[in-house]
Amino acid sequence: SHGVVSNVVDLYMFLKALMEAELISESSLDLMKDYTKEPENLSNIKYGLGLEFRQHDIYGTAIGHGGRSSGFTSEAWYYPEQNAYLIYCINAGTITNGPVKRLIDEDFREAILSKLFN
């Protein structure tokens, strides 16, 4: 669906206000957080109403969402156990599986998380 123009500050302000129930009611936020488990091949990812939940062995639960298209990736995550936010926009992205997607989705995120939490 594309079409949203933003930056890391706006994404942070939006996600923080959402997680603190400043944008919607607490009951609506609870509905968004009522997640369902994905198929076995995505065992660490769950989805709610517009929110994605990722379980990381070291850093715990991440709540947020990401998006990508050819040449661009953005992600906005909240780590409630650490009360920390990870938000980035980069000029690299692909919509197909492969080494570039893995580099961005796994290696890049892991490098940032290790600096953020260690």
What are these regions (language model features)?
Residues 1-118:
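Catalytic loop of the DD-peptidase/beta-lactamase superfamily, centered on the K-T-G motif
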